């Protein structure tokens, strides 16, 4: 409930709204501690009203406290139910975190002009990006499991292994030790595929690892993370199956230096774009600036990509309690890529790497 009160303070007292509609499943979990909910309407006065379809109603009743609960039947119009309650609460300025076009259109129609709608998901994002002690405890556990997975990667990668076999060993090791799942589709990108930052895969289609056989002397980018009580971690290492070539070692040392310089720059009050610039300068000075093709990092928490963002376009400033990634890389088409990534906690005066897997370039084969 403290989180709901914090949102009320931001949305109602500071911004002047008198209602807030939460529809993102992740945001709903953040505020209620219950997965599988549909929506929650928070009026300026009184309790928040949670909407759950009948399939999840008993779960919601069991897992939530301090809220009113309304069950929706299959096929019932959610936006009509929300609008009815908003009118009953005399809400005139209704903020929301996210709505697709059709839901927005339906809600506006049902409200009949009695309340103005405005997207304000950034207010929830501002709360979520500062982790409290309980969240940090869970993220430390997720990072611990992730570190275990990366150690397995170093022990598993060898010539003749298939990419999906390496992923399976990593994921099994993390699951066996308590991971609730994987933070995202594990990326095992070997050979020329390592020059693609996501291993040639897609967010929804997957494909971060394939049936390709790892060959002796190839670069292998391993990007993976564990989940613990819905909180995630993220780590990347670049590993050679065999003895590294001179060029591979050169690229690795440049990326490692970029990673380490960025880590020094991650501190409370730092501009996120300046941290990105610090990492980017190291790579540019070495002659590979055009091959660092993405931002330095992103926030991690209930989602593997959330605020704040570390890039040249970011307007974010870092603050105590932020958890972000530090992941510079160099990607040479036809040769391969190198990336090193850690999940980092912003502390008072410094930064702490939550992930701490090996930093060796050579596999333990």
Tell where the protein language model's regions lie, with residue ranges:
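Active-site neighborhoods and metal-handling regions in enzymes and metal-associated proteins
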Residues: 1-365
């Amino acid at each position: 409930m403290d989180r709901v009160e914090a949102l009320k303070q931001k949305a109602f007292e500071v911004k002047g709204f008198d209602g807030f509609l939460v529809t993102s499943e992740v945001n709903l979990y953040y505020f209620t501690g219950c997965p599988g909910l549909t929506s929650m309407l928070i009026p300026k006065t009184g309790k928040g009203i949670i909407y759950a379809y009948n399939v999840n109603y008993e779960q919601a009743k069991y897992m939530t406290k301090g809220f009113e609960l309304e069950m929706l039947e299959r096929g019932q119009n959610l936006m009509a139910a929300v609008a009815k309650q908003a009118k009953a609460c005399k809400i005139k300025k209704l903020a929301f975190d996210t709505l697709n076009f059709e839901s927005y259109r339906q809600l506006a129609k049902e409200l009949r002009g009695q309340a103005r709608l405005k997207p304000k998901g950034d207010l929830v994002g501002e709360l979520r990006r500062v982790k409290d002690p309980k969240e940090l405890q869970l993220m430390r556990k997720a990072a611990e499991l992730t570190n275990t997975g990366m150690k397995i990667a170093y022990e598993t990668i060898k010539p003749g292994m298939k990419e999906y076999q390496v992923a399976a060993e990593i994921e099994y090791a993390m699951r066996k030790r308590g991971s609730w799942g994987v933070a995202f589709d594990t990326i095992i990108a070997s050979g020329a595929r390592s020059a693609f930052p996501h291993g040639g895969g897609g967010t929804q289609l997957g494909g971060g690892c394939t049936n390709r056989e790892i060959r002796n002397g190839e670069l292998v980018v391993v990007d993976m993370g564990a989940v613990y009580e819905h909180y995630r971690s993220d780590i990347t290492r670049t590993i050679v199956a065999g003895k590294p070539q001179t060029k591979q070692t050169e690229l690795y040392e440049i990326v490692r230096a970029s990673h380490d310089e960025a880590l020094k720059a991650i501190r409370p009050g730092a501009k996120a774009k300046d941290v990105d610039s610090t990492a980017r300068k190291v790579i540019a000075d070495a002659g590979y600036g055009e091959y660092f093709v993405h931002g330095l990092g992103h926030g991690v928490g209930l989602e593997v990509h959330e605020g704040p963002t570390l890039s040249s376009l970011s307007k974010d400033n870092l603050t105590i309690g932020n958890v972000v990634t530090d992941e510079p890389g160099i990607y040479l088409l036809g040769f391969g890529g190198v990336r090193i990534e850690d999940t980092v906690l912003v502390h008072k005066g410094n930064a702490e790497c939550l992930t701490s897997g090996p930093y060796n370039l050579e596999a333990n084969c």
